[in-house]
């Protein structure tokens, strides 16, 4: 089992109870916060710092759907970020070009409303992709899940570019 799932005592699956994850994170972070070990030995202080770092990393992994999917794939021996998973279907490549063109047009026109609409469109695509990932994991279609993770990474990056272009 993945260390991230183990730390939070969660079953390794794509869908997680995000409220439970957040509650457990806060409880564990409070339990192992380095300030609680200020009077402890140097070894115990170092252990607390290391545990806090591990908790933060595990929480980052499990709180983001694509990172969680990549972790599940890693458990199957599949690196979702490997080059063989970068071949996208032609339709997705065309959609990427259309989104980039729409972003450039919106930037050139300083059209924040157009950027917001583009961001909303891509957010809807992300939600559809998360639904596909659920299906791929349920059917144990790990190669398709890896492709979907790569597509999702593009969507994340595109939304970051939109926010940057919009000034936020």
Residue ranges and their predicted role:
Residues 1-168:
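C-terminal accessory/regulatory regions appended to core domains
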């Amino acid at each position: 089992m993945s260390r991230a799932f183990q730390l939070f005592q969660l079953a390794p699956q794509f869908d997680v109870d995000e409220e439970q994850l957040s509650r457990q994170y806060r409880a564990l972070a409070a339990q192992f916060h380095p300030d609680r070990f200020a009077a402890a030995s140097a070894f115990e202080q170092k252990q607390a710092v290391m545990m806090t770092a591990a908790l933060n990393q595990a929480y980052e992994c499990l709180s983001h759907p694509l990172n969680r999917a990549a972790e599940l794939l890693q458990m199957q021996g599949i690196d979702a970020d490997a080059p063989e998973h970068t071949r996208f279907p032609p339709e997705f490549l065309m959609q990427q070009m259309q989104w980039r063109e729409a972003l450039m047009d919106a930037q050139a026109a300083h059209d924040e409303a157009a950027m917001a609409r583009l961001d909303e469109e891509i957010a809807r695509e992300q939600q559809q992709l998360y639904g596909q990932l659920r299906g791929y994991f349920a059917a144990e279609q790990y190669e398709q899940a890896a492709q979907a993770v790569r597509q999702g990474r593009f969507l994340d990056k595109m939304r970051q570019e939109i926010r940057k272009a919009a000034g936020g």
